[in-house]
Amino acid sequence: MEQIVGVRFKPAGKIYYFDGNDLELHLDDGVIVETSRGLEYGYVVTMPTEAEKDEENPMKPVIRRATIKDMAQLERNKAREKSAFDICLQKIEKFKVPMKLLRAEYTFDRNKIVFFFTSDGRVDFRELVKELAAVFHTRIELR
């Protein structure tokens, strides 16, 4: 048996399920989890429940409850996202890329910045990505 807990990364966002890792977790607790994007900070939104362990498709575990340091890191990331957004806008104008930037998100561990955008068609943003990677010294993803 494993303890399953629902975690949300954004208010009103999708709920993802993780192995509670035998941690004592409560609703609205901040937690650090491993996702396909890297380490992420989320909030517990469902009470932990017991479930059969699926050996073929194991759930990723909650790494730990969020600490005060983690909360401070989250706030620093939010501030950096604003700066990253502004810098990306400048680079979009510089390269005249036909896209509208929606938002920027750092992963919790700052291994990657994801820039969300819309465009009317396919966009060649290879030069933009190279420039952003040089500025931020981290992996860049455009979605």
Task: Cite the ranges covered by each PLM segment.
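Acidic-enriched and Gly/Ser
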Residues: 1-143
